[in-house]
Amino acid sequence: MDKEARIISHFTHALNGDDGALLGDFVYSKDLFIENVHFKREWLSMQGIGAKAVLVNLSDAIAMNATPLYALLGLALPKELENDEIDALCAGILSTCAKHGVSIIGGDTTSADKIIISLTIISKANKKTLFRKKAKIGDFIAFTGSLGLSLKGLKILQNGGKIARNSRFIKPSLRIEFMKKSAKILTSAMDISDGLANDLPKFLGKKGAKISAKLSKNQWLSGEEYELLVAFSPKNKARVQGFAKQTRTKLTIIGQVKNGYLKIPKYRAFKHF
């Protein structure tokens, strides 16, 4: 058991283990966004840091087909930050929240030796809430968008290069419209944050899968993609593909859910610890 799994095992509860927790009519989700873990200050503008912190948090709610409404913000900042840097960071957070209809209703601030942003998103559950591990035997497995672009951008930055402000690493794409249209016929969903090689086993739970698509190493390993990983019945294949076309969302079917084991390439996948 790796350290992340060990930590999580101490806090098992019927409501956790998914992208968010469904409690009554609301879904609660949280992600941390930490300097030198998820980003370096020289890679993103302060406004870009604030914006991405919000986007990666909204991704969990969208994967569960919930509508984000409110946020609680925890903000720890180094004392050496200038006022204009603080203003830019807050502007990125606020403008991105406003764009997605989210109001910040509380939180806390403190000092730290690096930037730490913690958001708790409170979302309205829609008619059908989607969870991990609910795919049925025979269901197709697919992901939205293109995987590998976030890792490509990260490698460029690590080598001292520059990437476009709208690159996947800086600005993840949230598949809101696709989810709104397709949720009613999906059986399971989650967002891809730790790379497909890490997230597919979490998505399937105790089920296996036959992977028919030929994917590159970067597609398997690229984290912080925030694309959707979804499952749906073969009888709904044409409808899901139709919704993808209507919303201009690339959709790649990679295999089907099966009894037995999941066989994926043995790459060294990302670990938090």
List each language-model region with its residue ranges.
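Helix-biased detector of long, well-ordered alpha-helical tracts
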Residues: M1-F273
